[in-house]
Amino acid sequence: VGFKAGVKEYKLTYYTPEYETKDTDILAAFRVTPQPGVPPEEAGAAVAAESSTGTWTTVWTDGLTSLDRYKGRCYNIEPVAGETDQYICYVAYPLDLFEEGSVTNMFTSIVGNVFGFKALRALRLEDLRIPTAYVKTFQGPPHGIQVERDKLNKYGRPLLGCTIKPKLGLSAKNYGRACYECLRGGLDFTKDDENVNSQPFMRWRDRFLFCAEAIYKSQAETGEIKGHYLNATAGTCEEMMKRAVFARELGVPIIMFDYLTGGFTANTSLAHYCRDNGLLLHIHRAMHAVIDRQKNHGMHFRVLAKALRMSGGDHIHAGTVVGKLEGERDITLGFVDLLRDDFIEKDRSRGIYFTQDWVSLPGVIPVASGGIHVWHMPALTEIFGDDSVLQFGGGTLGHPWGNAPGAVANRVALEACVQARNEGRDLAAEGNAIIREASKWSPELAAACEVWKEIKFEFKAVDTLD
């Protein structure tokens, strides 16, 4: 066939409604808003082309490969209900386009340059179906939910955490003391804030030492295993690994990483180190809202959550449904299931566009954090279930009597909710009564109930289905 130079419409090559998807294809659902005058077939085909083999003009070297084997294909287009000129375009990518075990490479293709494409007004990646053949090239979470419970010897209830505040400005000694008070009071974990790395007021090594002391002292007093998420995030990968190694030498159970600001390559390396060395890995999602909060452009958090499960992390922040940070109930529970379960059915009412089989890749524990306090405990226990970490920062440290009583209040509230649930009571209907009953025999809980009885963060959720 002679080479024919010139520009041709994308849809002639990349829009293939007759295509039957393969079990090995990576499938993507994009929300596409074309520029006025651009037909949806052309827009969908352009997305498939620009995120796979295509470029803006026919090139001579196209003849040296098999486009049919390597091209992305837009195989289905649906109008978005209630929106004019907006479509869900489904694209199938052959597996050969992606390097094994690399979330970085997968994202560079699928959510790379195509998002700056001029023929589109906006583009959002709503969901990805990762084929089992590709899932199997990833280690995934260092340990997963069951192994974590076995390591910590904690079963049958959510775990409790607390982010140490003020997030910046404490000395290492005072920071360690705050950790100790929380852990002694009954929490399972305390947490470095995501922006605590190694600053002039508190260098990382000092913090690690004082927090390790807090862990060992509180473990000795309570007879429970305790942890503090030591943030290993750093300016270079070498420095990050140095911090992880030091944490392992201290014998602590868990470290933490900011996976979006730190990057997927660094995260995957750290996850491999954590599995090899018995460390749990807590993941913070700082920067996610830059990517996922706009409805029409960017990437939905469920995609970032899937990517994290592949790259590796044992915990990840996932919104609260009830606190100060974003999260609409059905949608949040949709990606919480994607993190924890082995098999998730397609369910558009929860924003899940594809059935996903994780073929026994370990699960990730979702972390509910942000503006939550004791009055939220029944709702959180009901919504998130046992396999979750409930994190109360201000909701622990803001207690009028101090950190340890704040921790006691949270632990009593949690134990009361778990017991009530196990006795068959309805947490949604009786939640406030359950907390009030428990506060009768816990002065710490009674004081917490009094402080936060009126606090609500009532705003309309941005992340709705449509």
UniProtKB/Swiss-Prot annotation:
Q: Which residues carry this modification: N6-carboxylysine?
A: 191
Gene Ontology CC: chloroplast
Binding, substrate: 113, 163, 167, 285, 317, 369
This protein's UniProt keywords: Calvin cycle, Carbon dioxide fixation, Chloroplast, Disulfide bond, Lyase, Magnesium, Metal-binding, Methylation, Monooxygenase, Oxidoreductase, Photorespiration, Photosynthesis, Plastid
Kindly list the positions annotated as binding Mg(2+). Answer: 191, 193-194
Which Gene Ontology BP terms does the record give? photorespiration; reductive pentose-phosphate cycle
The EC category is: lyase
Q: Specify the protein name.
A: Ribulose bisphosphate carboxylase large chain
The UniProt entry, under Pfam families, shows: RuBisCO_large, RuBisCO_large_N
Q: Which proteins does it associate with, and in what oligomeric form?
A: Heterohexadecamer of 8 large chains and 8 small chains; disulfide-linked. The disulfide link is formed within the large subunit homodimers.
Q: What is catalysed by this protein? A: 2 (2R)-3-phosphoglycerate + 2 H(+) = D-ribulose 1,5-bisphosphate + CO2 + H2O; D-ribulose 1,5-bisphosphate + O2 = 2-phosphoglycolate + (2R)-3-phosphoglycerate + 2 H(+)
UniProt lists the gene as rbcL
Q: What else is known?
A: The basic functional RuBisCO is composed of a large chain homodimer in a 'head-to-tail' conformation. In form I RuBisCO this homodimer is arranged in a barrel-like tetramer with the small subunits forming a tetrameric 'cap' on each end of the 'barrel'.
Annotated CDD domains: RuBisCO_large_I
Q: Report the cofactor remark.
A: Binds 1 Mg(2+) ion per subunit.
Gene3D superfamilies documented for this protein = Ribulose bisphosphate carboxylase, large subunit, C-terminal domain, RuBisCO large subunit, N-terminal domain
Where are the N6,N6,N6-trimethyllysine modifications? 4
Spell out the family assignment given in the record's similarity comment: Belongs to the RuBisCO large chain family. Type I subfamily.
